[in-house]
From Swiss-Prot:
This is UDP-N-acetylglucosamine--N-acetylmuramyl-(pentapeptide) pyrophosphoryl-undecaprenol N-acetylglucosamine transferase. Its EC number is 2.4.1.227. The lineage of its organism: Bacteria, Bacillati, Bacillota, Clostridia, Eubacteriales. Keywords: Cell cycle, Cell division, Cell membrane, Cell shape, Cell wall biogenesis/degradation, Glycosyltransferase, Membrane, Peptidoglycan synthesis, Transferase. One of its GO terms (cellular component) is plasma membrane. Its main location: membrane.
Length: 357
């Protein structure tokens, strides 16, 4: 018998969904029944259903910072989404809503506020995304990942919790990872991750220096859907994947170094695993600049080296990898000196307190 019911929401990208999944086991241990509200065709639908969590779908319009003719119709989708969410909340009667952001979350948060249901939200990046900015007035508490984020949260709603880490990430097997990749030589391993869709510029840079890199390293390259290079399928010491799921914990634990974009959820997983990282954040041309802030924060803490996209010319990436290798012990020592409580426990504590008020 459950003590409480929480309805989670968040979607649009995997980064708005996977942290929710990290919380589910602890929520259930604390007596919560867990259900989910997402969009009709977002990435969250498949992910949540694959984890056997009851799923409700609502209408949702995308929130854009740029001109698009859909900006005229999407507000009506948001209004319908509020109506859809209100109907679900009236029937389900949850004790609390937990929002991870993304455009689908806004109607749910507003509907919860109208029904006087407490809302706890979480922001992964250093500055709040548009969805969390719009949701903030209707939230009881907004959990943040970076200490620097607290200054952006009004009305004393901000709580520093860090980023929830999926338990399975911490229990990968290096031996299994090496088996998956089929590496024959004993070399240090670099894992390259270009985000869920891959990164052409990172892929091209790595492959352009591949023969040089393979002298000293084995390479695991998660290159994104449609980005496999058929000419490199049987290249010794080089294993490429379009996308990985169940294998990811093993591959991450196999890696000695990680080259990656700077999404907050991912880099905190690397930190939890004590993996020295070279971060190549999305440029301001392709984003709101949040990854640049994330990367620089980790650089300042001594957890990472940073190489901006516009610096990816000639031998800069190769030289930065050599610098990462030479600073391996220093970076790991900085990570080991980190003062960090269990983020999942902190977030669940905030959720419980929001109910008991």
């Amino acid at each position: 018998m459950y003590k409480y019911k929480v309805i989670m929401t968040g979607g649009g990208t995997a980064g708005h969904v996977t942290p929710n999944l990290a919380l589910v086991p602890s929520l259930k241990e604390n007596g919560f029944e867990v259900k989910y509200i997402g969009s009709k065709d977002g990435i969250e639908k498949e992910i949540i259903k694959n984890n056997n969590i009851p799923y409700f779908q609502i209408s949702s319009g995308k929130l854009r910072r740029y001109f698009d003719f859909k900006n005229f119709s999407d507000p009506f989708k948001v209004l319908k989404g509020i109506k859809d969410a209100n109907r679900i909340l009236k029937k389900e009667k949850p004790d609390v809503i937990f929002s991870k952001g993304g455009f689908v979350a806004v109607p749910v948060v507003i509907a919860a506020h109208l029904r006087k249901i407490p809302v706890v939200a979480h922001e992964s990046d250093m500055t709040p995304g548009l969805a969390n900015k719009l949701s903030a007035p209707f939230c009881n508490k907004l959990c943040v990942t970076f200490r620097e984020s607290l200054k952006f949260i009004k009305d004393n709603k901000g709580v520093l919790t860090g980023s929830p880490i999926r338990n399975e990430i911490l229990h990968g097997s290096r031996e299994e990872g090496l088996k998956i990749c089929g590496f024959k030589q004993e070399k240090e391993v670099i894992l390259i991750m270009g985000g869920s869709l891959g990164s052409k510029i990172i892929n091209d840079q790595i492959r352009g220096k591949l023969n040089l890199l393979l002298r000293d390293f084995n390479i695991i390259h998660i290159c994104g859907k449609g980005n496999l290079d058929n000419n490199l399928v049987n290249k010794a010491g080089y294993k490429q994947f379009e996308y990985v799921s169940e294998e990811l914990p093993h591959l991450m634990n196999t890696a000695d170094y990680i080259i990656s974009r700077a999404g907050a959820n991912s880099i905190f997983e690397f930190l939890a695993l004590r993996k020295p990282m070279l971060l190549i954040p999305l440029s301001k041309k392709a984003s709101r600049g949040d990854q640049i802030l994330n990367a620089n924060s980790f650089k300042n803490e001594g957890y990472a080296l940073v190489l901006n996209e516009e610096e990816l010319i000639n031998d800069t990436l190769y030289n930065k990898i050599l610098e990462l290798k030479s600073n391996k012990k220093i970076i790991i020592n900085a990570m080991n000196n980190m003062n960090g409580k269990n983020s999942i426990d902190l977030i669940v504590e905030v959720i419980l307190k929001s109910i008991k008020r």
